[in-house]
Amino acid sequence: MGNLFGRKRRSRVTEQDKAVLQLKQQRDKLRQYQKRISLGLERERELARQLLKEGKKEKAMLLLKKKRYQEQLLDKTDNQISNLERMVQDIEFTQIEMKVIEGLKIGNECLNKMHQVMSIEEVERIIGETQDAVEYQRQIDEILAGSLTEEDEDAILEELNAITQEQLELPDVPSEPLPEEPPEATPVKNRPKPELVAAS
């Protein structure tokens, strides 16, 4: 139990992870700032309209200038958010590339070790030995096949014909099912034996 809950595993948070988190937090703050400015712009527009109705043109003009400045700030904020998002994407993609490169490095090391164990010369030697063994076996097969005389060939054919003939002469298997129990034997009645008559 102590091992299970006592010690926490170390979190493997990298510097890149921290940077991505900070960039995303900054982006979220900028979005909140944008929302606040957008709400303020709507209010100031309504207020400028009200001031114009009241005949306070200069105050309305001043308010619209402020509104215009805040709209420019919104545009700048959009650009900053785009830059932050691009930076986050670049960091995340670079992390993926680093993992791919690390995988390629490990794979390359593995291949090099395998090549050291099995060099081209070793492969060529094994293939050569295999071809030699196949050729040797082929020669043995040819010798064995060529060692049969004409009499042997005739004897083989004769045996083959005999086996074929045996199969042809076998009786057919009855198609009717066999009775389950054999019929009981009926006893033969005792006949009286004829008496022998002596010849006179």
Swiss-Prot record:
Subcellular location: Endomembrane system; Late endosome membrane
Cited Pfam families: Snf7
Key words of the record: Coiled coil, Endosome, Lipoprotein, Membrane, Myristate, Protein transport, Transport
Domain of life: Eukaryota
GO annotations of cellular component type: ESCRT III complex; late endosome membrane; multivesicular body
Region: Disordered, residue numbers: 169-200
Protein topology in the membrane: Lipid-anchor
Primary residence: membrane
Motif (Type-2 MIT-interacting motif): 168-179
GO biological process: late endosome to vacuole transport via multivesicular body sorting pathway; protein transport; vesicle budding from membrane
S-adenosyl-L-methionine recorded as keyword: no
Lipid-bearing positions (N-myristoyl glycine): G2
Coiled-coil spans in chain: 10-94
Similarity field: Belongs to the SNF7 family.
Subunit structure, as described in the record: Probable core component of the endosomal sorting required for transport complex III (ESCRT-III). ESCRT-III components are thought to multimerize to form a flat lattice on the perimeter membrane of the endosome.
Its job: Probable core component of the endosomal sorting required for transport complex III (ESCRT-III) which is involved in multivesicular bodies (MVBs) formation and sorting of endosomal cargo proteins into MVBs. MVBs contain intraluminal vesicles (ILVs) that are generated by invagination and scission from the limiting membrane of the endosome and mostly are delivered to lysosomes enabling degradation of membrane proteins, such as stimulated growth factor receptors, lysosomal enzymes and lipids.
Name recorded for this polypeptide: Charged multivesicular body protein 6
